[in-house]
């Protein structure tokens, strides 16, 4: 198992209940593929640099996970099927960032 960080951008108009459901479905997916979610951080609603699927804002979430690298493509496929996720990116890291990250801290 190797370390990965996964960032998901959800549609901005989702209720907190739907966001929680997407979050739990994602965690279940990762567990089903033999991975483990170590930490997660909600970055909240942020402006997008450019429009994605007609959205100018997105709700960001970060997941730190350990998973077999061969299973990342399966995770990507399941994320592509989730209609409430407008973009996602999983990257391999040597070690996980300490939380809270800069993105997760409130602006002054």
Summary of predicted features, one role per range:
Residues 2-108:
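Structured, basic alpha/beta domains of bacterial-type, RNA-associated proteins
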């Amino acid at each position: 198992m190797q370390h990965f960080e996964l960032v998901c951008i959800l549609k901005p108009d989702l209720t907190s209940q739907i966001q929680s459901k997407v979050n739990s479905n994602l965690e279940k997916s990762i567990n089903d593929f033999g991975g483990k979610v170590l930490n997660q951080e909600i970055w909240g609603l942020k402006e997008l640099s450019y429009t994605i699927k007609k959205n100018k804002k997105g709700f960001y979430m970060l997941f730190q996970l350990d998973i077999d690298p061969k299973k990342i493509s399966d995770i990507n496929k399941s994320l592509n099927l989730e209609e409430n996720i407008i973009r996602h990116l999983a990257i391999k890291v040597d070690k996980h960032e300490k939380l809270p990250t800069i993105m997760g801290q409130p602006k002054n």
